[in-house]
Amino acid sequence: MAELPIAPVDRLIRKAGAQRVSEQAAKLLAEHLEEKALEIARKAVDLAKHAGRKTVKAEDIKLAIRS
């Protein structure tokens, strides 16, 4: 189950042009977004560790997104 709130995901789908959004659709997208965010976060943590830091910086996130 996704930890991301469903309401903001619903708003994103509506912002993309949907007039109505089923709860199941919003939940499914929230789960996918969370999986992708965790993947990026893990890469960013690895990059910070490789740089000898405990703190994840914006540059780590940017690099993780690109890779």
Swiss-Prot record:
Annotated InterPro entries: Archaeal_histone_HMF, CBFA_NFYB_domain, Histone-fold, HmfB-like, TAF_TATA-bd_Histone-like_dom
Major subcellular site: cytoplasm
Keywords: Chromosome, Cytoplasm, DNA-binding
Pfam families according to UniProt: CBFD_NFYB_HMF (PF00808)
Region: Interaction with DNA, residue numbers: 20-22, 54-57
Cellular localization per UniProt: Cytoplasm; Chromosome
GO molecular function terms listed in the Swiss-Prot or TrEMBL record: DNA binding; protein heterodimerization activity
GO CC annotation: chromosome; cytoplasm
Record flagged with keyword Endoplasmic reticulum: no
UniProt cross-references to CDD domains, sorted A to Z: HFD_archaea_histone-like
Oligomer and partners: Homodimer or heterodimer with another histone. Dimers then assemble into higher oligomers, with the DNA wrapped around the protein core.
Function statement: Binds and compact DNA (95 to 150 base pairs) to form nucleosome-like structures that contain positive DNA supercoils. Increases the resistance of DNA to thermal denaturation (in vitro).
Family: Belongs to the archaeal histone HMF family.
Protein name according to UniProt: Archaeal histone B
Native source organism of the sequence: Pyrococcus sp. (strain GB-3a)
